[in-house]
């Protein structure tokens, strides 16, 4: 009995499908549109029951929604100012105004955005304490356990100015006693006689001048150093004078006629002005006969 029931249910299903979608048997022209309209109406009612239909004029991409942009210019300027301030601060700003063609109220003007911290007005209204940089911003970023003196680094010490590097005299230094003219003359005469004194001579000489042995000893040491400096300066002068000097003709100086410089200049001029395959221009020679006074040698010398 079970196979018979299955066989009878199959033709019934096919019949229903054919009756719903296939053409009628009569094939009349006036009958097909009515059936199609009935089918479309039935499907539309099912979709409307499942999803509410939105008017075409309220869609975001409709012509009415695109042409219904009635926002005030003040709202645009506030949004632009806020976006520019946010871009300068490195943050992202989302527009709070109503988008054109939104489902809310397309014709309602968008309310101006309140001034934030990143807008120009917000920056101008901030107190001066907020605009001034904190003295130590690292303290704000630290956790409580880092702010404890045990874990926090010691405060930076201010560097004191460097101490004076000049040599300081001893506190117990004796004041300098100036020598009299008679003592200086006697010391100078004794130094010319003998630069080094023995202990006995120094004791006798210091007692005759009413000076201590230390004062006489130090004066002789300073006088020997001065004599050494003077001697080195004299030797340097002698070395400078002994070095050969440059010929005066090299500096273009003129001498009287018949002098050695005139002969050397004439020989050089004849040498360079001689005719040959590679002829050179004659060197300029100072007029010899214009100056009759003898010019001294220069102080320049060859090293």
From Swiss-Prot:
Annotated GO CC locations: nuclear periphery; nucleoplasm; nucleus; transcription regulator complex
PROSITE patterns: HOMEOBOX_1 (PS00027), HOMEOBOX_2 (PS50071)
Any single Pfam family the record assigns to this protein: Homeodomain
Compositionally biased tracts (Low complexity): 32-44
Region of interest: Disordered: 22-53, 90-112, 135-163
Residue ranges of DNA binding: 172-231
An annotated Gene Ontology molecular function: DNA-binding transcription activator activity, RNA polymerase II-specific
Subunit annotation: Interacts with CREBBP/CBP, TBP and SP1; interaction with these transcription activators may inhibit autoinactivation. Interacts (via C-terminus) with PIAS1 (via N-terminus); the interaction is required for the localization of both proteins to the nuclear periphery and specific binding of MSX1 to the core enhancer region in target gene promoters. Interacts with H1-5.
Name this protein carries in UniProt: Homeobox protein MSX-1
Organism: Mus musculus (Mouse)
Lineage: Eukaryota, Metazoa, Chordata, Craniata, Vertebrata
